[in-house]
Amino acid sequence: MEVDTEEKRHRTRSKGVRVPVEPAIQELFSCPTPGCDGSGHVSGKYARHRSVYGCPLAKKRKTQDKQPQEPAPKRKPFAVKADSSSVDECDDSDGTEDMDEKEEDEGEEYSEDNDEPGDEDEEDEEGDREEEEEIEEEDEDDDEDGEDVEDEEEEEEEEEEEEEEEENEDHQMNCHNTRIMQDTEKDDNNNDEYDNYDELVAKSLLNLGKIAEDAAYRARTESEMNSNTSNSLEDDSDKNENLGRKSELSLDLDSDVVRETVDSLKLLAQGHGVVLSENMNDRNYADSMSQQDSRNMNYVMLGKPMNNGLMEKMVEESDEEVCLSSLECLRNQCFDLARKLSETNPQERNPQQNMNIRQHVRPEEDFPGRTPDRNYSDMLNLMRLEEQLSPRSRVFASCAKEDGCHERDDDTTSVNSDRSEEVFDMTKGNLTLLEKAIALETERAKAMREKMAMEAGRRDNMRSYEDQSPRQLPGEDRKPKSSDSHVKKPYYGKDPSRTEKKESKCPTPGCDGTGHVTGLYPHHRSLSGCPHKDRVPPEILAMHESVLKCPTPGCTGRGHVNSNRNSHRSLSGCPIAAAEKLAKAQEKHQSCDVSKSSQASDRVLRPMCFVKQLEIPQYGYRNNVPTTTPRSNLAKELEKYSKTSFEYNSYDNHTYGKRAIAPKVQTRDISPKGYDDAKRYCKDPSPSSSSTSSYAPSSSSNLSCGGGSSASSTCSKSSFDYTHDMEAAHMAATAILNLSTRCREMPQNLSTKPQDLCATRNPDMEVDENGTLDLSMNKQRPRDSCCPILTPLEPMSPQQQAVMNNRCFQLGEGDCWDLPVDYTKMKPRRIDEDESKDITPEDLDPFQEALEERRYPGEVTIPSPKPKYPQCKESKKDLITLSGCPLADKSIRSMLATSSQELKCPTPGCDGSGHITGNYASHRSLSGCPRAKKSGIRIAQSKEDKEDQEPIRCPVPGCDGQGHITGKYASHRSASGCPLAAKRQKDGYLNGSQFSWKSVKTEGMSCPTPGCDGSGHVSGSFLTHRSLSGCPRATSAMKKAKLSGEQMLTIKQRASNGIENDEEIKQLDEEIKELNESNSQMEADMIKLRTQITTMESNLKTIEEENKVIEQQNESLLHELANLSQSLIHSLANIQLPHMDPINEQNFDAYVTTLTEMYTNQDRYQSPENKALLENIKQAVRGIQV
């Protein structure tokens, strides 16, 4: 019972939820601890704090009450020091041994529950955590009144008492090793305080530092998750009770606050000139953490878990000298801090130390690899060395015992001597804790690295576990990640119930659902919207893609309304299926009179999911009741059957649009690869020859909406394999079974749709290499196929069943009835022919619609064995077809109800075709109706009424743009979606004429509707649209048009040969290819021309730049010439040449020419006068600088 309580508490902590024990006692916004006014809380100085998590007083009381449940061997490492006072103090904890054993047993039980047997460390840690919470919750009710100063003083008092008493107890345990059990019992409480000395001092420091509220919240969350996951990840820990108990407010070592604290401690250590020791279990852990790191790690590594106190003492004494110099430095620092504390407010001094204590002591102690022996040995050695260095420590401890530590007191400005001593002593303890914290962090990092290999393996195991289990503990998911980075990652509590559902995730390996087209759902079960489809192995991709293709045999997705996607999963928009519908409807009209045909189905050519395959034509009787199916959730429903595969090695040439397609029925299991065993259809009329094969319920390919199902087939003379394409059979089975659920609910409505199958097959059926079937109806076909009768189990009178069976059996070898099959509840009905003779026409009425007679050109029809009822009977259920959408059963009631007429589109004259949201005759909204008009003007106005309107906008003469499918824009410039164009095309089709504005392009039309030029199609204004889906004239053509034999033959051949075999399409493809090639050539030429133009432009720019340079040079030369001219004129102004005027600008050229001639021909100027003249000229020109 106690273990259950502890586990409940454990789960509560993992969620980060804290529930007060007695909420009625709490005040609305105050700390629930009696005597606590909110001061000193970890999360802030808020008196309105409502939790005991950060309450220092509750922590103190909790630690006092926890000690009786701690096992004695955990305290042996402290038995190193001897103190006479400890002997007297060890007499007040009798009777705690039983509680220790009980605690240990509980810890073992919890460890076994978590699949970690044999770890006392984790057991004790978990037990202490839970005991800690229990005491904490109890203390919440006891600690509400009181004053801050008193609480702080009491706590500081007890902290110092713990220090002194624990030292005494250690000495006593060392000196009296034979009395260890007795000492433990006597000094249990004091020893607990000593064990938690670092915790209490850390809390006091936290009260001074007032760590930010967010840091405290993160600390609580991290510690809770650590405690939650400690049991599953502690493999090397040994007796770690105290460590688990102290993990409640630990912070993440990877946080910024912790890093800052570590940096500050390193600086503090380096300031004392201390060098790290390299003796760390033969590891050079050069973390440069400080002298505390080195010293403490020596003790941690040497002080292995030894339960012998004497061994601990020997290890301690052998290493004391290593720490002397460092402790001396710390002692000096201690005195300095004490003096500062006596003069300043402690809150201004200790925030960094507070951070360190909270962020280092807690995380290190929470580390699973540590043992309490090491912790105790570290602290014991350090404190003993401190006492050797400073005899005043005991004095300060006693002072703290008597007066209490007021370090957290807000009134620390007091400078009395007692307070100074207390502050100094607490500072000493704080520095000790800083040393211990750094040592713990060092060992934690080392042990983390040691456990990386183990964690890697565990991480792999957890991954495989995640694939099998939808839930797991949050800690199990986080721990392997933390080992990768050598430190703990911050983790916030998460409810395990919100974990992802692993059993229905995206089939792409490694995909978590992110980036899916349909949303960020990790449980997406389809490859269609997965952005990582390239990762999918080919076999998986093939399995999924095969289901996504168009179920029409021979269709590659080309010409579909919703683009050229091969993965189209619906018959809606398939041109082949639509053409087949048209052909079938034409034959129906030939067999029905015109007055009745006008009331036939208004959605025969509105292709929906599987409506082309399963609609049963009207040859001799009224067609069976059609059912409309919304396609909103088609893709999702079809995925249920995505793992069922089929083959179509053969396909009946009258299957499409003539009869329900029957998948093979396996006699044993249905494998995901498909139906391997052929369903055999025979024609022996003897019911005794029928054989039964069953569908085994399968999660991957259960074709029944209601669970397991069985199918019966009647076998006889000519057995054959009836296998066909995976997609076609899948869609057929889905469509046939979509009413299975409703069979139990409304048998009367379903009685008009007998779930029977008469399978006929032409052995000479032609299937080309692309799977395209020859569906032409002009071929002669022997009517020697079998007629298996499969009747529903659900309430049906034996007479009706007999009628259904005998109707088919009486056809004999020459004829057979084609009926839809029900795979949900099928059992062979064996009756005698005598019983069928007593059946009245009333019994046949619900089923007579389903019994049809096929009439094809050239075929010999055999009259029905039962009298025919009035053909083309007027009914609202005339041509509601069986839909392949799995959700058809959801709308069956409304579709079969007599009020189904109310579900049609309210637009007058609209039959549902051309609707944006689908070609549903039952569309009840004007939103997507192409014929809906907001202005009240009737769309069906005559051509003359609209001739006077603006013809420039919509190209259809007389159209004002209203009612366009693509928008109510009056300026619409396309005939696409124009209701007027659709109406005129329909009228023209009925009159055998075409419209002038589109008649030029009608020769190359690809829309299967005869006479349709592609205009007005829902999916766009493409004249070459190759689909009947959205064709505004398709429905009217089905209703009223009487196609000629040649036209019907053309349509049938086009549908049977497939789009790929259409010569027009091939020719268009060739033309497109040629155009693409020519376009590529033109683009290459353009690129060359652009390159040449660019080169020429660059050359032109270069020439222009050169010209500019030349012009600048010319300008400079002209300027220099002008200067020289002026200088020459000034120099020769006084020299008069013979026969010339004095030099000036006007005769300058002539003057220069004369001078040049004189100097060139000096021989002619040898007279003294000329020589003197030349000499004067030389002297005058000599001063000119050229």
Swiss-Prot record:
Zn(2+) 1 binds at residues 31, 36, 49, 55. Keywords: Autism spectrum disorder, Chromosome, Coiled coil, Developmental protein, Differentiation, DNA-binding, Intellectual disability, Metal-binding, Neurogenesis, Nucleus, Phosphoprotein, Repeat, Repressor, Transcription, Transcription regulation, Zinc, Zinc-finger. Residues 1-21, 56-175, 220-247, 342-372, 449-513, 659-709, 753-780 are annotated as: Disordered. Its main location: nucleus. Transmembrane segments: none annotated. The modification Phosphoserine is found at residue 250. Interacts with SIN3B. This is Myelin transcription factor 1-like protein. The gene is MYT1L.
